Amino acid sequence: MFSNQLKELKIPIKTYLNTAKQRAKNAGYDPKLLSLSKDKEYKLNYDGVNFGRSGYGDFIIWSILEDRGLVEKGYAEMKQNIFHKSHTKIKGDWKNNPKSPNNLALKINW
């Protein structure tokens, strides 16, 4: 479960979720509809849509670790660029669906 990943990294769930909600708000989503996913495979749920694969880092996690000095400065942004380059190439109609898991991950997790 994602909460276990956060515990291992010593990142309070509230810290992660509040950051995710702020990123959701900045991207034009209603932060009240964002919560931790109850599905073990995913990190977050937005209005019934699970997204963000558990077990992997994301911009929020890498930024927190960067702030703590556990990864070098610029690492979160470098990982963000890699994620965006690969995931914007995914085929399908996800670009036209703001609630697609890929769109949500790109805008909230990354």
Q: Positions of the model-derived regions?
A:
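Arg/Lys-rich, low-complexity, intrinsically disordered basic segments
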Residues: 1-110
